[in-house]
């Protein structure tokens, strides 16, 4: 049969529109108006629950408030695909969402049918399918040769490697018998057909064993989960790590905590944004015992990472100051590797001290049905059960409810009752898996790993953002160089949010102190300790908390001092009180006299100090030479580097990419 390719291009869109929910409708409509044969028209919609009400195809702004978000595809009669996420919804709520989506899809399919009718004969009369060549004698001979052996294998409760080896042996023996019976010339012509017959027979026999004997390939019951082994703190240098093994599927997952500079740019057509939660899924060829070239991420890697990531994201705390990166390396695979990634990712987060709301586990469900009305719902499916089955239904969630799901149904006639049964069975399996995970770690560790980066966050006034950054980012970059930290500043309506990332407390304290010195606003009457920075005829310039103020010679003591150099020298420590701060220039008058007893033993009153401050006499040193400290414009040195882009982030480094 010829392949059919439909290419969908987004030409233009309203920024509030969600074009992904319309792609299926466009695809099916294109086929509907062509002469390409199709078993059934389909469509897809997004269904979300917003403020307790289900909405079909909501806009992007409305979707921000949704606690359920699913894309559903279906024909007129049956659901065929589901993918989405939820804030721990129940199984019944998911089924309710599917039913609402299905009703909307039926309307869209009817519109396609009317469109095809308008096109007329070109759309209504489909081209005939080419006949597939058949050879009944070869087909019967394969059934006679291989059926019994395949049946015995299906009942043998074997592992993946043993099963594969035995299938190859049966196939080779069958080929040899066919070659002897029909000769080389015939078999050379019908080799592909013979392979097709063998694969179809294998599928039929194994499916019949499941339905008739209630026996799975590895000997499990329908609702039985494979043995689980998991461990945390597996990698000594990672910020968190875990190994999760379920049967013959294993994920080694690591957690890395980075800075805001490490956020991933999600460059979508309508909603480009930075994401501080990243999950990467790697499926190397050795995980299935194969030799293949290592290329970039394919659909499998992207799709599995997306499903696992959206499932775990639902339990991430909102106040995590780090960029969180989870990497799942599949070491061996025999089905459900994406669900192993969910489990291993959760364990790694808890091992790393990330305070997730609740552990998340995932399970892959399958189904096998026949035209006699028999159906088996299988928990924790194998790779072979996925290939020969009729459904692949991945469900993730906490003990409370569902956080993510992905379902593909390959047959017609999957009633809602069976979907509900699959969801209930999936919940039972999920709870079992969560129990096994709890044996390794039940709650997140209280602290981060010793070698994980530390971070502090605090706010600064909006007027000081430019002063901290400096012209062209000069000040913040020098601060990072001196302290060995990475500093980022984000701006919101309330000012600036500063995040400092460093390897230890000392580096954080050093950077924090420098920033506090810049944003420090001195208050009249406050006591401070400072250091003499420079002497002049009329007084001393004192440095404290990153600021500089003038102590006039008359404010050193109650007795007359002719030369300030007689009592102070550069580098001397000194305690003083701020006598006055000029509201316009920020220049400060400092006084030791204000905190020194008078000759009669009494202390100066606030009124006396205020009177001296108002009289002036502090001496003027040429105005802006020192600027009195605290003037934002002087510190910025004439502006420079604006508030956005790289200057705000102050450089830094870290991982980026897959």
Roles of regions detected by a PLM:
Residues 1-4, 39-41, 108-127, 161, ...:
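Flexible, glycine/charged-enriched surface loops at secondary-structure junctions
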Residues 1-4, 10-12, 17, 76, ...:
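Glycine-rich, flexible beta-strand/loop modules in the N-terminal catalytic cores of phosphate-handling
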Residues 34-158, 349-446:
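Mobile "lid/hinge" segments at catalytic clefts and subdomain interfaces of large enzymes
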Residues 1-3, 73-75, 143-144, 280-286, ...:
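Flexible hinge/switch segments at interdomain interfaces of large molecular machines
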Residues 451-453, 464-658:
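Single-stranded RNA-binding regions, centering on S1/OB-family and related RNA-binding modules
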Residues 17-35, 231-255, 334-354, 466-476:
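Conserved phosphate/anionic-ligand binding catalytic regions in large, soluble enzymes, centered on
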Residues 119-133, 432-458, 505, 509-529:
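Long, charged amphipathic helices and adjacent flexible linkers at domain junctions
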Residues 124, 128-271, 456-467, 475, ...:
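Extended amphipathic alpha-helical scaffolds
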């Amino acid at each position: 049969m010829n392949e059919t390719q439909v290419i969908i291009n987004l030409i233009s869109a309203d920024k509030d529109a969600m074009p992904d929910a319309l792609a299926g409708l466009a695809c099916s409509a294109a086929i509907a108006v062509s002469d390409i044969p199709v078993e059934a028209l389909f469509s897809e919609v997004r269904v979300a629950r917003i403020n307790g009400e289900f909405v079909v195809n909501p806009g992007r702004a409305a979707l921000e408030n949704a606690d359920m978000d699913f894309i559903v595809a279906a024909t007129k009669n049956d659901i065929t695909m589901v993918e989405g996420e939820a804030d721990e919804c129940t199984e019944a709520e998911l089924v309710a969402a599917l039913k609402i989506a299905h009703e909307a899809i039926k309307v869209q399919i009817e519109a396609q049918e009317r469109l095809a009718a308008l096109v007329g004969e070109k759309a209504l009369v489909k081209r005939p399918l080419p006949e597939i060549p058949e050879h009944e004698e070869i087909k019967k001979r394969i059934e006679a040769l291989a059926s019994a052996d395949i049946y015995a294998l299906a009942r043998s409760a074997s592992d993946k490697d043993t099963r594969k080896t035995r299938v190859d042996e049966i196939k080779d023996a069958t080929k040899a018998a066919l070659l002897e019976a029909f000769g080389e010339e015939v078999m050379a012509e019908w080799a592909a057909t013979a392979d097709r017959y063998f694969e179809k027979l294998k599928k039929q026999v194994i499916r019949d064993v499941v339905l008739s004997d209630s026996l799975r390939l590895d000997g499990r019951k329908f609702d039985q989960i494979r043995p689980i082994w998991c461990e945390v703190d597996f990698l000594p240098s990672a910020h968190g790590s875990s190994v999760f093994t379920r049967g013959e599927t294993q994920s080694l997952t690591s957690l890395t905590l980075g800075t805001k500079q490490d956020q991933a740019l999600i460059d979508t057509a309508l909603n480009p944004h930075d994401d501080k939660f990243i999950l990467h899924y790697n499926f190397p060829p050795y995980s299935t015992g194969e030799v293949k070239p290592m290329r970039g991420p394919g659909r499998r890697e992207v799709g599995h990472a997306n499903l696992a990531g959206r499932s775990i994201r639902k339990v991430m705390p909102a106040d995590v100051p780090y960029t969180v990166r989870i990497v799942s390396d599949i070491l061996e695979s025999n089905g459900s590797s994406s669900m192993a990634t969910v489990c291993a990712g959760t364990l790694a987060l808890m091992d790393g001290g990330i305070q997730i709301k609740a552990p998340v586990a995932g399970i892959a469900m399958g189904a096998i049905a026949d035209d006699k009305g028999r159906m088996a719902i299988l928990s924790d499916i194998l790779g072979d059960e996925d290939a020969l089955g009729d459904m692949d239904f991945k469900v993730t969630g906490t003990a409370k409810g569902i956080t993510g799901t992905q379902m593909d149904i390959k047959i017609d006639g999957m009633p809602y009752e069976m979907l509900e049964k699959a969801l209930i069975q999936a919940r039972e399996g999920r709870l079992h898996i969560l129990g096994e995970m709890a044996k390794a770690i039940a709650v997140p560790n209280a602290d981060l790993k010793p070698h994980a980066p530390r971070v502090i966050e605090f706010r600064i006034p909006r007027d000081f953002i430019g002063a901290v950054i400096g012209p062209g980012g000069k000040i913040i970059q020098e601060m990072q160089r001196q302290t060995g930290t990475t500093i980022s500043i984000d701006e919101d309506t309330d000012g600036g949010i500063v995040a400092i990332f460093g390897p230890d407390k000392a580096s954080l304290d050093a950077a924090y102190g420098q920033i506090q010195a810049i944003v420090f606003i001195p208050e009249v009457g406050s006591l401070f300790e400072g250091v003499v920075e420079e002497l002049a005829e009329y007084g001393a310039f004192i440095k404290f908390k990153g600021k500089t103020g003038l102590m006039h010679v008359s404010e050193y003591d109650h007795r007359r001092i002719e030369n300030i150099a007689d009592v102070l020298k550069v580098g001397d420590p000194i305690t003083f009180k701020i006598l006055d701060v000029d509201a316009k220039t920020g220049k400060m008058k400092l006084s030791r006299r204000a905190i020194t007893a008078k000759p009669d033993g009494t202390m100066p009153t606030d009124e006396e100090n205020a009177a001296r401050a108002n009289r002036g006499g502090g001496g003027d040193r040429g105005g802006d030479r020192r600027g009195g400290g605290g003037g934002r414009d002087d510190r910025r040195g004439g502006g420079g580097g604006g508030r956005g882009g790289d200057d705000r982030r102050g450089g830094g480094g870290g991982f980026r990419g897959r």
